């Protein structure tokens, strides 16, 4: 864990809960699909809004959709198709942890992200 060197679980949890937002971005790494791994030469990337992901665990297992929102505070993502109705009868997105999804297609419109992929690429 990049935030602490302690082996005590309580201190590791505390460092996760109190981590600054620029370090929380590291917690959003998700596995890439095998096709993307071969194409990009990278095993995992941080999830971003606009990526297409497949949910691998939980009630919405197998659901594929675009990432609508990324919540850095709660370390959760919101995916099209993973919805429920709240007590008012409104449809709301269900929060999903990024480690429970697999990225199927990435949004490559950002030049900085392309540089990140080139930097992480295995030779």
UniProtKB/Swiss-Prot annotation:
The keyword Membrane does not apply. Keywords: Ribonucleoprotein, Ribosomal protein, RNA-binding, rRNA-binding. Part of the 50S ribosomal subunit. Belongs to the universal ribosomal protein uL24 family. One of its GO terms (molecular function) is structural constituent of ribosome. It holds the Pfam family Ribosomal_L26. One of two assembly initiator proteins, it binds directly to the 5'-end of the 23S rRNA, where it nucleates assembly of the 50S subunit. One of its GO terms (cellular component) is large ribosomal subunit. CDD domains: KOW_RPL26. SMART domains: KOW (SM00739). One of its GO terms (biological process) is translation. This is Large ribosomal subunit protein uL24. Gene3D superfamilies: 2.30.30.30. The lineage of its organism: Archaea, Thermoproteota, Thermoprotei, Thermoproteales, Thermoproteaceae. The keyword Ribosomal protein applies. The gene is rpl24.
